[in-house]
Amino acid sequence: MKTYNIVIASDHSGYELKSKIINYLEQKCLNIYDCGTQDTQTVDYPDYAKKVVDIIIEKAAPIGILISDTGIGMSIAANRSSEIRAALCNDILTAENAKAHNDANILILGAKSVDNKIVFNIIDKFLTTKFEGGRHSTRLSKIK
């Protein structure tokens, strides 16, 4: 199976933001796998959350990004798997803590709630922050 740096998907309401994010990440020479959707026709977000989750569980990509209107439904759908730690992040601090303290492996963005002026900063912080381990590992073991 081919491996990727990042797997990404959105529902119809996140399609435009997803397209911008893919362009941004490709400029950074990252290998992106786009699981859809490919237009703004109405689709069901759980189907796209499952695609990203399955790819991460299969270890074909270490990080995922999911986008819907608020991100709440995507968060619920993605977090149904015990191997997934999906975090809804609408600011830089939340993205940093999601990785540093919770070892999040999926970044969830709300297309209607995230500030487009900082969305790339949020993504960069999520991608570059390392898990701190230590007491955070102990806490994570309690929720597996």
Curated annotation (Swiss-Prot):
Gene Ontology BP, a term: D-allose catabolic process
Domain of life from the UniProt record: Bacteria
InterPro entries (UniProt xref): RpiB, RpiB_LacA_LacB, RpiB_LacA_LacB_sf
A Pfam family it matches: LacAB_rpiB
The enzyme's E.C. designation: 5.3.1.-
Gene3D superfamilies: Sugar-phosphate isomerase, RpiB/LacA/LacB
First-level EC class: isomerase
Residue sites binding substrate per the record: 12, 135
Active site, UniProt feature: 101
GO terms assigned for molecular function: ribose-5-phosphate isomerase activity
SUPFAM superfamilies: Ribose/Galactose isomerase RpiB/AlsB
Keywords noted in UniProt: Isomerase
Disulfide bonds: none
PANTHER family: DNA DAMAGE-REPAIR_TOLERATION PROTEIN DRT102, RIBOSE-5-PHOSPHATE ISOMERASE B
Name under which the protein is recorded: Putative sugar phosphate isomerase RP299
